[in-house]
Design a protein with these regions (language model features):
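N-terminal secretory signal peptides and thylakoid transit peptides that target proteins
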Residues: 1-14
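N-terminal glycine-rich flavin-associated loop
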Residues: 109-139, 168-217, 233, 237-263, ...
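C-terminal cap/substrate-recognition region of VAO/PCMH-type FAD-linked oxidoreductases
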Residues: 42-46, 198, 212, 241, ...
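C-terminal segment of N-terminal export signals and the immediately downstream linker at the start
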Residues: 1, 18-57
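Glycine-rich, histidine-containing beta strand-loop boundary motifs that form or position
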Residues: 10, 68, 123-124, 145-149, ...
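Surface-exposed loop and adjacent secondary-structure segments within mature catalytic domains
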Residues: 153-183, 222, 226-230
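Glycine-rich N-terminal segment of FAD-binding domains in flavoprotein oxidoreductases
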Residues: 76-81, 121-169
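Conserved oxyanion/phosphate-binding beta-strand-loop segments in alpha/beta enzyme cores
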Residues: 59-110
């Protein structure tokens, strides 16, 4: 038993179990508790066999993948062309978002000792999430969930874990009149968002196409599901509250592999917990429905337009704003990182 196991066991063992039996028995109890919560790793004999992983791949329609960090190229040859390409890509948040081995916190969270998840299920539908949750539970694997990859605690990825990567689950549906399942509330405008959508996609759909506003975050590459579950303070929070306050309903897969609907009437405790309790804490969210608001008449716009390898005369601010708003949302091939942040006009 090492010091880590003793500390974990101490935290997980009720205080009453430490009273009476003496230090030897208490230490053994702590060790047992630590072993109970220890996840299976590749070096353990209980690690799933190749046949087991193949079955999971079949259950998810071929969406299981082994996760390999592109930073491995820098460990082999720090000055080689492959490593230079990786560093060039790391300047672009879209490059990071499209690789399950990277997160938006890679630069300052164990960057040079990157240990991504062992495998990832690139989920396309709720059934893929159910299969991954059941597989992780049955095999005692650590499970992580990655949407936008902005977890500042590094929980978007973990070594020797199974990742549920929701990037492809980004359908967005606008509702003129939405009523949560089983509720008697009057209908209201809303938007249903897949767990893998980022705010840039949502703002484009809701504001540009729908003429409405949805309370979200100021950074366009942040994932919707993670921000809402973390509370979600944004540009208009003084007017509309947090992103979590706009949540009307969520579909979530809990640890028992059951798909549940959470709203004010159905599973209200779970609904309460999802609004700020932390991403992936109570299950894996597959979609969310958020309240939308009337689009404000006046906006204050802050524009970040970073370009790599681009030279020439910088145009005046007004032309830069007009040109940026006319361009497509993402131009990763040009090394461009652009963010629009809107706030109350004052």
């Amino acid at each position: 038993m090492n010091r880590r196991e003793l500390l974990i066991g101490a935290a997980l063992t009720p205080m009453a179990r430490w009273i009476g039996p003496g230090p030897v028995a208490a230490a053994q109890s702590a060790s047992n508790s630590a072993q109970m919560f220890r996840r299976t790793r590749p070096s353990d004999p209980q690690w799933p066999s190749a046949a087991s992983w193949n079955r999971l791949n079949e259950q998810t329609d071929g969406h299981l993948m082994a996760v390999k960090s592109p930073l491995a190229a820098c460990q082999d040859s720090p000055s080689g062309p492959a490593c230079r390409d990786v560093f060039k890509g790391l300047k672009n948040p879209y490059y990071i978002g499209d690789d399950p081995a990277l997160t938006q916190t890679t630069g300052y969270l164990d960057a040079w000792a990157s240990q991504p998840s062992a495998y990832a299920v690139a989920a396309r539908k709720t059934g893929d999430v159910v299969a991954a949750v059941n597989f992780a539970r049955d095999n005692n694997l650590r499970l992580v969930v990655r949407g936008g990859g902005h977890s500042y605690l590094g929980t978007s990825s973990a070594p020797d874990s199974l990742m549920i990567w929701t990037r492809a689950m980004r359908d967005i549906t606008l509702h003129d009149s939405f009523i949560p399942q089983g509720c008697l509330d009057p209908p209201q405008p809303a938007v249903t968002i897949g767990a893998g959508a980022i705010w840039m996609h949502v703002y484009n759909e809701v504001m540009t196409r729908g003429g409405r506003y949805v309370q979200g975050g100021g950074c366009g590459t942040v994932g919707v599901a993670g921000l809402v579950q973390g509370g979600g303070f944004g540009s208009y929070s003084k007017n509309y509250g947090t992103a979590a306050a706009s949540l009307l309903e969520a579909e979530i897969v809990t640890a028992d592999g059951v798909v549940r609907i959470a709203n004010a009437r159905s599973n209200p405790d779970l609904f309460w917990a999802l609004r700020g309790g932390g991403g992936g804490t109570f299950g894996v969210v597959t979609r969310m429905t958020l309240r939308t608001h009337a689009l404000p008449e006046h906006l204050r716009l802050r524009l970040h337009d970073h370009q790599s390898g681009v030279s020439g005369v910088i145009p005046p601010p007004r032309e830069r704003i007009r040109g940026s708003l006319r361009r497509p949302p993402a131009q990763p091939s040009l090394g461009r990182d652009r963010q629009h942040q809107a706030g109350p006009y004052a």
